[in-house]
Amino acid sequence: MSAAVWQDGEDIILKLYIQPKASRDKIVGLHGEELKIAITAPPVDGKANAHLTK
């Protein structure tokens, strides 16, 4: 597994880099040692966090 994803017992840990206000939601790929996720929600009032957890 890469440094962005690893297993800890029964848990899988993801190290994420989130890009808010993207043109569409998608998994972009690796960004250094993090998995880059693009989301359409803006980083205002927790909207990006709420969108990511859907």
Swiss-Prot record:
Transmembrane segments: none annotated. It comes from the Bacteria. It holds the Pfam family DUF167. Belongs to the UPF0235 family. This is UPF0235 protein in proC 3'region. It comes from Vibrio alginolyticus. The lineage of its organism: Bacteria, Pseudomonadati, Pseudomonadota, Gammaproteobacteria, Vibrionales.
